[in-house]
Amino acid sequence: MTSTPFHDLDAFLDIPRISGLAVSPDGSRVVTTISTLNSKRTEFVTALWELDPAGRQPARRLTRGLKGESAPVFTAGGDVLFLAVRPTDDDDKPPAALWRLPALGGEAHEMLALPGGVSSAVSARGADITVAAAPLLPSAGDVEADRVLRKQRKDNKVSAILHTGYPVRRWDHDLGPDQPHLFDVEAGRDLTAAPGIALQESTFDVSPDGSFVVASWRVPAPGAASRSTLVRIDRTTGTRTTIADDPLADLELPVIAPDGSALAFTRETHSTADTPGRITLCFMRFHSCGEWVEVATDWDRWPSAVTWAADASTLIITADDNGRGPVFSVDPDTGAVTRLTDDDHTYTDVCPAPGGIIYALRSSYTAPPHPVRLDPDGTVTELPCVDAPTLPGDLTEITATAEDGTPVRSWLTLPESTDPAPLVLWVHGGPLGSWNSWHWRWNPWLLTAHGYAVLMPDPALSTGYGQQFIARGWGAWGEAPYTDLMAATDAACAHPRVDASRTAAMGGSFGGYMANWIAGHTDRFDAIVTHAGLWELDQFRHTTDGAYWWAREMTPEMTQRNSPHRFVDRISTPMLVIHGDKDYRVPIGEALRLWYDLLTDSALPADDNGESPHRFLYYPAENHWVLTPQHTKIWYQVVTAFLDEHVRSQPAQVPGLLG
């Protein structure tokens, strides 16, 4: 058997990880970031690396800060801007600042440092102008007042936040009391006085000449809801004008054409209890008196990222598509869609360059993210960077037929051995998502190296198969998504290299919900792992970080019909519950109630000694995903031990560091 990094968790964590991509306006330089473990193996540290656009020379490291660098952006003159935390004698834990690395050489220098840090930056393509996002406290009239007030809060150990609206937290962090602003970096000027919630989760772009900014701008909606509009902000005066608004949709991801003449963005309609939202591509010319139109309305895919070709002639987008994530070009005038890539990869961080060239990162279940160049003739060239790890098995694709006749496709990993392997059904999160790209956190090859075949299906609600495929499961999570998963499992069990008599199911987030639902509706699996899973839907819909979004689908009737907690008495399969306390998307209360219900009301309750086959892996300081290296390692150790115990009848090997 071939030894690979997936046979050893430490070796797996040692693999360098590529993320992000930036290309200079003239296309002559390409920069990415690579993350590696620190010496204590408790944190990933990211550095900037320059790539050879021709694909011949090895990558060259640009930065070596102890705390790392991220978010590279090129200026019009070819300098590289980036975010970095760099301690000083006066402050050993400063927030992230914006730094500039000159194109002509020399040391990087600090460009913008603010008391609350800098979150992101965008530079104009044709002028030495940069706009950055950074937070300010609402009662601070300027940056200096913000600095004083932050120091007062710190010195007095005050962390209290007085909210007047919603939301109050996001994913794993509290919102407030500071609010995101946009700053003209060169002038040191705040462009967005008193924005309130408007720039939370906002994206923005700067015109090529730097004269204006277009940003997504959140406005209040009835109740606790909000929606996203688009505004144009004059960089000199700060005057803000709403240029696109739709009461029935969120308008997001604005991107200005390289010649400054037009704007592209996405429109996501608000869902209802019966109908899922839909994401479409939109376009407007700045001289058209504010009129904007949807583009390619008959194209049955959701754009996930939008940019422009370097000559501003077409839009370059990515979208999930049948278990892949290709690159497409779209004619903004006719709506004609052309697929530019034809492989099994998913493309991200797409950066068009002059001459019709496109740089991007791509990944699949055969390779982690790696940089590539797409030429106009369709040729794809890998840019030397990090060698892809050897895989511990094979990847195949299978298709099942759902109860209603709909095809349900899946990826299936198989161990090297030709002996039939036990099967793990792994359900993706979202639920609006797809198993179509490499995951460092949810990695099937670690289980495959351990001897398991891993099934990764895209059931109803998955993206990349059209609007009707999503609608099949909308408001009915326990119906078509569940039966699709069972059909996919049946198809995998028919594979000659799968042992159908030894199976388990697992998933995270929505996948955790499905694991909980599966546990109460079938006893076909020997073990079930539920990570950050939804358990009591009526409880979840009121306590999640963005309750107004979920409330559109989760009516009282929907939650009653689809809530897994109603079937706890039918659960006769050992369950491993995993949850992080800092998870605000699926709050810890879901796991706490599930754990109590399993021990008291399931078909496998705790005995008179308080013992049961169920387990609860709790992370006090982790979030929705459990991201730190040391806790990722324990996650896989506990999961494989639990699977081995109940699927293979092997003694559980609990990590010693758990005490």
Residue ranges and their predicted role:
Residues P459-G659:
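Active-site-proximal cap/loop segments of hydrolase catalytic domains
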Residues K40-V45, D89-P95, H173-D178, P222-S228, ...:
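Short, solvent-exposed loop/turn segments at conserved positions within beta-propeller repeat blades
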Residues D52-G55, P102-G106, E186-A187, D234-G238, ...:
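Short loop/turn segments that connect beta-strands within beta-propeller blades
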Residues I15-V30, L66-L81, A108, A113-I129, ...:
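Conserved beta-propeller blade repeats
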Residues V386-H495, D499-S501, G508, F540-H542:
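Cap/lid segment of the alpha/beta-hydrolase catalytic domain
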Residues D79-D142:
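Hydrophobic or amphipathic alpha-helical targeting/insertion segments
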Residues V45-T46, P135-F183, S228, I279-T280, ...:
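Predominantly five- to eight-bladed beta-propeller fold
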